[in-house]
């Protein structure tokens, strides 16, 4: 009887480990670095949502409402035209579901950036490259 209990516990432990691993393997974190001496930095968390991707931004030092986007390119060479608009960062937080798969976004060639304000879109305050294979 004790042998069956130990076996059942071992099976449950393995299942819990597998479930935890698959959930975290689907989530991708992107480091957001300060730009133009803004002092703003944080993390973008990308999670698959079917053929779309949920993007959650957590930005420290952000003030007011700041437009954010996913652009083609890297932080060093952003295409000025946004590929996917994100909900503005308000009080350091933003959450958006974009119509792009995780596979597409993590194939390389995209970056997430934030602008100082709707009136000053040319000043980037944070940026993070979505690297291939993340």
What is the predicted role of each segment?
Residues 2, 6-9, 15, 19-134:
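N-terminal leader/targeting pre-sequences
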């Amino acid at each position: 009887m004790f042998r069956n209990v130990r076996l059942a516990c071992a099976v449950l432990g393995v299942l819990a480990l597998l479930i935890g691993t698959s959930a975290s393997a689907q989530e991708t974190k992107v480091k957001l670095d300060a730009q133009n001496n803004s002092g703003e930095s944080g993390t973008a968390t990308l999670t698959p949502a079917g053929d779309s991707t949920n993007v959650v931004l957590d930005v420290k030092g952000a003030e007011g409402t700041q437009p954010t986007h996913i652009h083609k390119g890297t932080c060093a060479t952003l295409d000025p035209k946004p590929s996917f608009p994100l909900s503005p960062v308000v009080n350091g937080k933003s959450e958006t579901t974009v119509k792009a798969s995780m596979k597409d976004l993590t194939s390389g060639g995209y970056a997430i950036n934030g602008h100082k304000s709707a009136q000053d879109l040319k000043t980037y305050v944070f940026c993070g490259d979505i690297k291939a294979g993340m």
